[in-house]
């Protein structure tokens, strides 16, 4: 099974289950991936409501407790990238949540994940590597920070970051994903055109993405910076504690 088949199968399973919104998808990922077919919407919701739950995908971190680190670059190369995530509690009027455990993971510039590979899902074998994965605990301001490289993309998905949030006791609060702004002057477009990245030919935009096609307003990040100086992502995730 390849990644596109996995996402499609997972989406159907979520619709059938209904009770598992984390698996619900409503668009096929074999739609036109060469152009944006809908209007680009990079708006960010400010509502005090739980962030959408999403699938953890086929490449979740296997032992996140062993990857407590802020610098997740390892041996990967790419445009410098920092990730700042704030976690808020909707049951406390969206006050910043201290002590939440945050796991993140994303693909490298070529669209590959560590800890997996050698299969139809991902041909390149990185089963023994752990790059671009990390865990941090939110501070008094509800924040965690990571140093990484700007992620690439792979067939069937827009650029994204996976996030799993737990309470201080290690109980799961939310599995979600972070979306990236799109457009000609977006970081996604600028990085894709830079040295070492693969461009946007065949790219799946948010409007056609299996996960994001139902809307990205509470999953959309803000990304600033330049290719030469690096980019910085900020994002707020809202959970129920």
Indicate residue ranges for each PLM-predicted region.
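Exposed beta-sheet edge/beta-hairpin loop segments within beta-rich domains
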Residues: 151-154, 222-228
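C-terminal region/CTD detector
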Residues: 8-11, 15, 227-233
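N-terminal secretory signal peptides and thylakoid transit peptides that target proteins
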Residues: 1-14, 29-30
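Low-complexity, intrinsically disordered Gly/Pro/Thr-rich segments
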Residues: 212-225
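C-terminal motif of bacterial Sec signal peptides marking the signal peptidase cleavage site
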Residues: 24-25
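Beta-strand-dominated extracellular/periplasmic modules and repeats
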Residues: 35-215, 234, 238-241
